[in-house]
Amino acid sequence: MSGVNEIRSAFLNYFAKNGHDIVPSSPLVPRNDPTLMFTNAGMVQFKNVFTGLEKRPYHRATTSQKCVRAGGKHNDLDNVGYTARHHTFFEMLGNFSFGDYFKDRAIELAWNLITKEYGLPKDRLLVTVYSEDDEAFGLWKKIAGLPESKIIRIPTSDNFWQMGDTGPCGPCSEIFFDHGDHIFGGPPGSLEEDGDRFIEIWNLVFMQFEQVAPGNRTPLPKPSIDTGMGLERIAAVLQGKHDNYEIDLFQALIRAIAELTGADPQGEQKGSLRVIADHLRAASFLIADGVLPSNEGRGYVLRRIMRRAMRHGQLLGAREPLMWRLVWALVREMGQAYPELVRAEAMIEETLRLEETRFRKTLERGLTILDEKSGSLKKGDMFDGDTAFTLYDTYGFPLDLTQDALRNRGISVDIASFTDAMDRQRAKARASWAGSGEAATETVWFGLRDKLGATEFLGYDTETAEGVVTALVKDGKEVEALKAGDAGAIVLNQTPFYAESGGQVGDTGVLTGEGVRFRVTDTLKKAGDLFVHFGTVEEGTVKPEAALALEVDHSRRSSIRANHSATHLLHEALRQVLGDHIAQKGSMVAPDRLRFDFVHQKPITQDELRRVEDIANDIVLENDEVTTRLMAVDDAREAGARALFGEKYGDEVRVVSMGKASREHGSNAFGWSVELCGGTHVRRTGDIGLISVTGESAVASGVRRIEALTGRHARQSANAAMATAKAAAAELRTTLDDMPARIASLMDERKKLERELSDARKKLAMGGSGAAGAADGGADVRDVGGVKLLARAVEGIEIKDLKSLVDQGKKQLGSGVIALVAKSEDGKGSIVVGVTPDLVARFSAVDLVRKASEVLGGKGGGGKPDMAQAGGPDGSKAQAALDAIAAAIGG
């Protein structure tokens, strides 16, 4: 049982034998929990079970949970690579009891696992208990036979767990392993407890109280158990290692990195190897769970992780993208336990490759900006920390690289102000993740769900029905009546109204009864499967137990059905045209339009869009029957039905199929497009009428979006487009067929005129004959200390044209310096300085342009010794800037 995979399996199988359901790891992006950026503990997916808001079909569970700690208060990112046990990604083994067994059984199960199944020597184990938890103290003594000296009472909050200011809470008991007296450190609670000798391997939380208010706790009627054991830590113990990075899983990854880079796993670059191994795991699992690199939220944290790893790849000498070439090694080690890693392997590789390619461009851009911002600084000066943070936060330019680049010039970074800026950013990020405060209002829905049960949905077969009012809600509270003019919500025993889910908007319509009319403006799901009808009472008073006639807006529902079925066809068509890596990231199905978001790393060409549209419309024209069937979820997936990753499905699922399975790109025997879907659909594909793709765009890095119309909306859009095209053709005095050629001709003519205008501006700026005339003994050429200087302020010239004029001037001067300053419409000044080859040993264009930039109010400048550019906010001082250059040459 020495390998990580064997240790994980042994844990799960042990608890399964002891009556626990093995529950798969939840995604790293928490479902329905806006308070967390990432899943960071095993209990996260059971949070609502512990609080009583959710019920599961089991009372005991065991998991191996994927966790990430790289944001918010749980942030291990900066420590990774420098300690033996910090990770951004880790696995947490756990067992849970929801009102079933409690302390005695939890302690017995834990002790038997580590001493009998895992075989740890009892004399190297000790435990802690909360100082007031006499019960746990006695149970450890009785069950484990531990002497009192090895049952340590801890009076601090380290051994008392709370979910928040209110909610379930209780004492903890931690199990520690003694690595031996050859390692510094004392037992928990001692002065030397921060040493590495005694390492916590398992934490048992005994949830036995309800925190009603600060200082006010009441006993829970059904105490529960939540435990967590870091897989990497227990693996290190079982493999006789004191360092998590020396376990078999990490060593396999480190060997793969070393083979690609030539680095010595035990040499000076050991830290970089560890960073890459850890960050490879975090980045790969986050991408597999649907997170993609971006500049905000979860995507921003992922980007930080990836770029930190890529920077360490550079330190190892990697000159080409490295991380994507390591994914295979991770899949080999962890793919069996986490099949989502196997499914997403190609996407992970492509995302890492593209991000590292972009990062190299970021490095180049960052160095240029750094040069400009630090140009006026001298040896011994300090670089502004706010600017360093802007480079880091806005441009992705790492602080350590900023420090390295400035160190050669004897310039340090103001770390204090950088840290202040970082703290401000973190505070802002924490505030954005502080949650929406909806938990209290959601309680009413969970309470109604417990009391009333699930709503029976009739809408697959009908748009009209009769129902009985079972509850009324107004302003987040259950009420006994809704009167005319009241805005509120109605819960019914059954309904044909579809509740918003899976990207499909909720139905609208009317509920009518004797003297009563309620206009439904939206239908939403609450507490899982409680259908709630939101709207306004137009007539009468609605009361519980009233019988109502329920009528969905037929025209709106028909349009929604067409758009939802069209998303399925477009999804499959995209896979056929672009490849099987296409995976849905989201959708919006409304009555008047649809959009579909999917994983793809580059823009879709117009030809590809046309092919996608044509393929989807071919299925529409075939007018095939759309079939639905109920299947066991495992059978449906095995049959090839596509599912939205991370979506929660029940044991039985609805499978929607359309198109002939015999088509070239058929999904399986059920049809051409086969997906798990709970939405409403057309009866035949011909009911869609027409699919018109209206746009394609980027949503985030690696995520594209297509938008489309169907049916009459598509027809109206096509008619409007045709009318616009005809009007444009008339203006151009040509036909529709000849219009593209006519436009191309006009564009060529425009480019020609723009070139002529640019040439004219250059000549005018240089006195009517261009740089040559001005340079050839013109009034603007003067002798400064034996050096010819052509210096002139010009109007209306862009920076790229300034460079061109300076190049011409250098050629005409033969030997000398040319400086041109242009004032823009907004009053800013731009300056370009050129030095002929024979003078670059005496004068650097970079030094000269920086002198001028200071006069214009700018800082720094950049370029090469023979050509440099800069700018400043005050273009009115153009002549003074040129005089500063002359003074520098003459000095």
Curated annotation (Swiss-Prot):
Its cofactor is Zn(2+). Catalyzes the attachment of alanine to tRNA(Ala) in a two-step reaction: alanine is first activated by ATP to form Ala-AMP and then transferred to the acceptor end of tRNA(Ala). Also edits incorrectly charged Ser-tRNA(Ala) and Gly-tRNA(Ala) via its editing domain. This is Alanine--tRNA ligase. One of its GO terms (cellular component) is cytosol. It comes from the Bacteria. Its EC number is 6.1.1.7. The keyword Nucleotide-binding applies. CDD domains: AlaRS_core. Binds 1 zinc ion per subunit. InterPro entries: aa-tRNA-synth_II/BPL/LPL (IPR045864), Ala-tRNA-lgiase_IIc (IPR002318), Ala-tRNA-ligase_IIc_anticod-bd (IPR018162), Ala-tRNA-synth_IIc_core (IPR018165), Ala-tRNA-synth_IIc_N (IPR018164), Ala-tRNA_ligase (IPR050058), Ala_tRNA_ligase_euk/bac (IPR023033), DHHA1_dom (IPR003156). Belongs to the class-II aminoacyl-tRNA synthetase family. Consists of three domains; the N-terminal catalytic domain, the editing domain and the C-terminal C-Ala domain. The editing domain removes incorrectly charged amino acids, while the C-Ala domain, along with tRNA(Ala), serves as a bridge to cooperatively bring together the editing and aminoacylation centers thus stimulating deacylation of misacylated tRNAs. It holds the Pfam family DHHA1. One of its GO terms (molecular function) is alanine-tRNA ligase activity. Keywords: Aminoacyl-tRNA synthetase, ATP-binding, Cytoplasm, Ligase, Metal-binding, Nucleotide-binding, Protein biosynthesis, RNA-binding, tRNA-binding, Zinc. It catalyses: tRNA(Ala) + L-alanine + ATP = L-alanyl-tRNA(Ala) + AMP + diphosphate. PROSITE patterns: AA_TRNA_LIGASE_II_ALA. Zn(2+) binds at residues 564, 568, 677, 681.
